[in-house]
Amino acid sequence: MVRNLFVGRLLVAGSLVWAGSALAADVTLLNVSYDPTRELYVEFNKAFSAAYRKETGKSIEIKQSHGGSGSQARSVIDGLQADVVTLALAYDIDAIANKGFLKKDWQKTLPQNSSPYTSTIVFLVRKGNPKGIKDWDDLVKSGVQVITPNPKTSGGARWNYLAAWGYGLKKYGSEDKARKFVADIYKNVPVLDTGARGSTVTFVERGVGDVLLAWENEAFLAVKEFGKDKFEIVAPPLSILAEPPVAVVDSVSDKKGTRAAAEAYLKYWYTKEGQEIAARNFYRPRDAAVGEKYADSFAKVELFTIDDVFGGWTKAQKEHFAEGGVFDQIYKN
């Protein structure tokens, strides 16, 4: 039954919104999030709602919207009334801020640049790893099909792309060689889904591909739900430190009078319980004590940052993912 519920969530296309309770609440928030956080926020919202009622005496309902991070950001810009956004990468929230919906220094509002947990990119392979995939180099081999979403719509896909580029740059020593390496990976990609969850469906349910480039939490969730007899996780020795951020949407929360609740909601991530929830859902917690408790859950991977290798998200977005950027050039060819 658990598996069927997971599959049901997997097969929902596009942005999904649901309420935590059928009863009218004193406060209602809309959290616009990225694709593979659905299960995470089921647990987080339940815990926060209980804590909020205990603290304030008021009931709160959290509605969720999920989809590719870039698409979700555009939905907020186009009028989706998000009280908070919890997206895959800072650039997508910057895009919302640049339209005046929240202050441009929003990352200074909460600790760790408003990223309460981290993740990385790993490989999900079929049981027994029949293609012997162990590192990024294996993704360019003839006969290996790689599943990854479209970086024009998916934040996870951009992390996948940049992780591969960072590996290529370190191993081969030049931007030109890194470009060729990443281009060769995309020659092995048969389909680009719009979001990370869609790519999981393609790989897990439809049986397409030999390896899924995945958020670490998404890979763990697939193994948990479908079994170690079906899939296994390969953590490459080198990958990227992914820092999914969170922010209150000032214009919406002020208009709706929900700012206090929205701020409390995001601050709850930094409590012991919030960090425990992140870790239980296979995200790497920021809190050192919680991180130590769950240390054995996560592979030891050398992680590089987007700032160190790419000069930050603004530069990476412009160079690689803007119209006519490097991704467009290599994917066309």
For the regions a language model picked out, list residue spans one by one.
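Ligand-binding pocket segment of bilobal, Venus flytrap-like solute-binding proteins
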Residues: 171-237
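Extracellular/periplasmic juxtamembrane helices and adjacent flexible linkers that interface
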Residues: 253-333
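A bilobed periplasmic-binding-protein/Venus flytrap-type ligand-binding module shared by bacterial periplasmic
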Residues: 121-129, 243-260, 277-281
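Short beta-strand->loop
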Residues: 32-34, 125-127, 145-171, 185-189, ...
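N-terminal segment of the mature folded domain
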Residues: 25-154, 331
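Short helix-loop capping/hinge motifs at secondary-structure junctions, enriched
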Residues: 128-134, 153, 166-174, 252-260
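Sec/Tat signal peptide C-region and signal peptidase I cleavage site
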Residues: 18-24
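Bacterial N-terminal signal peptides that target proteins for export
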Residues: 1-11
